Amino acid sequence: MKIINIKIIRNNINNFSLPQHITPGSAGLDLLACIEKPVSILPKETRLIPTGIAIYIEDIEVAGIILPRSGLGHYYGIVLGNTIGLIDSDYQGEIMISLWNRGSNKFILYPGKRIAQLLFISILRVKLSLVKSFDPFMKTIRGVKGFGHSM
């Protein structure tokens, strides 16, 4: 198991807790809204919400991914404003979550509410090699067919 350093930036809510796996099978660690009072998110509005924590991954072959919580999106229309968040190994600032209300009703976010998931992934570091063309013996069935190629 890899150890990731975490620091509490602000602890301004009752029952503040560090990110945790809610069940033994949970892939992501739940991130909480570290806010002092409820925040309204109007339809089509985005709000930047603090989590109260910072992490230092340190290992350049690991990154953090911020993912939405499925229930918030499905039931309330609350999704991540940037669709996915990437935390580089050398970032040490507070983790902030951009929430977007894509729904048609006002959403009230309460202090301590679980708002996103943090997942750690391995990163394959590559070196790009510039070529003028690809080897003709390495042609694939797909080739250059892009979006919708298999429809």
UniProtKB/Swiss-Prot annotation:
Enzyme class: hydrolase
First and last residue of the signal peptide: none
Stored InterPro entries: dUTPase (IPR008181), dUTPase-like (IPR029054), dUTPase-like_sf (IPR036157), dUTPase_trimeric (IPR033704)
Keyword Repressor: no
Keywords: Hydrolase, Magnesium, Metal-binding, Nucleotide metabolism
Catalyzed reactions: dUTP + H2O = dUMP + diphosphate + H(+)
Keyword Hydrolase tagged: yes
Stored Pfam families: dUTPase (PF00692)
Cofactor(s) annotated in UniProt: Mg(2+)
Pathways per UniProt: Pyrimidine metabolism; dUMP biosynthesis; dUMP from dCTP (dUTP route): step 2/2
One GO BP annotation of this record: dUTP catabolic process
GO molecular function: dUTP diphosphatase activity; magnesium ion binding
Residues where substrate binds: 69-71, 82, 86-88, 96
EC numbers: 3.6.1.23
Function in brief: This enzyme is involved in nucleotide metabolism: it produces dUMP, the immediate precursor of thymidine nucleotides and it decreases the intracellular concentration of dUTP so that uracil cannot be incorporated into DNA.
Cited NCBIfam families: dut, PRK00601.1
Protein name: Deoxyuridine 5'-triphosphate nucleotidohydrolase
Gene: dut
